[in-house]
């Protein structure tokens, strides 16, 4: 476990995996350096954990989170807002493997969050008879904050083989104490260079949003990774990032008038004081 007030903990983790990770093959054929089991903690009162040693695209993070919360599984919403991070998995070639039209990703995050366990109609579409985990967890945080069941699961074993990319960030749990909301994410598969910086910021944003609509302050965001890996073709980029000095973390502003998680818009969220080094490009392993 590593705790830090900025991204030093993350940088220590990628340095450790670069230097000590086990070389392994992987599904994509790219090859990785991997380490099993890691944890990072961020006190959200100390700043919003958007990495500064490389520029991270907050617009993509925000719209992807909105997309999950909508229960949407088609990339049109993302593409309409200029977000391309799911394009590689939404091609006609990828979706045809599962009998779906181009752009339709199937029962991934949004579906599992908002309609878990839904049945299918005769036309293959999902009925709206599943569990709305987002609504339920918010109701439980408000009515039963001491519950140890404040959990949302994106992992459905019955459907994990029916999508091109099964959920990597699989389960998150909330914890309420002293008027503060904390969140822990378990990520089964952690692409440390490209994916994890997005995941840290996304779930930190979600924690802020849910805390606000539940009249709570923010506590910690805790990231727990299973297979934590660096792709072999990201090592040069990791070296470049590790050569940079981190800046202070920015602050997050949310429109205080918003009291329903589904009412947030892009203009209701603002990252203030974000100073970063330039972005570092790296290939995506599909």
Swiss-Prot record:
It is found in: Cytoplasm. The keyword Membrane does not apply. GO terms for cellular component: cytosol. The active site is at 168 (nucleophile). It comes from the Bacteria. The keyword Cytoplasm applies. One of its GO terms (molecular function) is thymidylate synthase activity. Signal peptide: none annotated. Keywords: Cytoplasm, Methyltransferase, Nucleotide biosynthesis, Transferase. InterPro entries: Thymidate_synth/dCMP_Mease (IPR045097), Thymidate_synth/dCMP_Mease_dom (IPR023451), Thymidate_synth/dCMP_Mease_sf (IPR036926), Thymidylate_synthase (IPR000398), Thymidylate_synthase_AS (IPR020940). Catalyzes the reductive methylation of 2'-deoxyuridine-5'-monophosphate (dUMP) to 2'-deoxythymidine-5'-monophosphate (dTMP) while utilizing 5,10-methylenetetrahydrofolate (mTHF) as the methyl donor and reductant in the reaction, yielding dihydrofolate (DHF) as a by-product. This enzymatic reaction provides an intracellular de novo source of dTMP, an essential precursor for DNA biosynthesis. Belongs to the thymidylate synthase family. Bacterial-type ThyA subfamily. Homodimer. This is Thymidylate synthase. It comes from Psychrobacter sp. (strain PRwf-1). The lineage of its organism: Bacteria, Pseudomonadati, Pseudomonadota, Gammaproteobacteria, Moraxellales. The gene is thyA.
């Amino acid at each position: 476990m590593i705790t830090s007030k900025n991204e030093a903990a993350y940088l220590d983790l990628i340095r450790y995996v670069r230097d000590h990770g086990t070389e392994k093959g992987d599904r994509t054929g790219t090859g990785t350096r991997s380490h099993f089991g890691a944890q990072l903690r961020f006190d959200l009162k100390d700043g919003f954990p958007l990495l500064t040693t490389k520029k991270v695209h907050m617009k993509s993070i925000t719209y992807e989170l909105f997309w999950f919360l909508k229960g949407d599984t088609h990339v049109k919403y993302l593409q309409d807002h200029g977000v391309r991070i799911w394009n590689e998995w939404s091609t006609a070639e990828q979706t045809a493997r599962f009998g779906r039209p181009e752009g339709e990703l199937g029962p991934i995050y949004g579906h599992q969050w908002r309609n878990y366990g839904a049945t299918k109609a005769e036309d293959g579409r999902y009925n709206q008879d599943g569990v709305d985990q987002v609504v339920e967890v918010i109701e439980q945080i408000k009515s039963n904050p001491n519950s140890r069941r404040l959990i949302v699961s994106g992992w459905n074993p019955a459907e994990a083989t029916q999508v091109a990319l099964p959920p990597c960030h699989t389960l998150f749990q909330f914890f309420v104490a002293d008027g503060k909301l904390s969140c822990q994410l378990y990520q089964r598969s952690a692409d440390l260079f490209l994916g994890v910086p997005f995941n840290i910021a996304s779930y930190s944003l979600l924690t802020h949003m849910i805390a606000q609509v539940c009249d709570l302050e923010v506590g910690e965001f805790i990231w727990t990774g299973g297979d934590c890996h660096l792709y072999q073709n990201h090592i040069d980029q990791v070296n470049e990032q590790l050569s940079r000095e981190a800046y202070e973390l920015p602050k997050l502003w949310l429109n205080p008038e918003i009291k329903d998680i589904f009412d947030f818009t892009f203009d209701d969220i603002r990252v203030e004081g974000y100073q970063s080094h330039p972005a570092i490009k790296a290939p995506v392993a599909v």
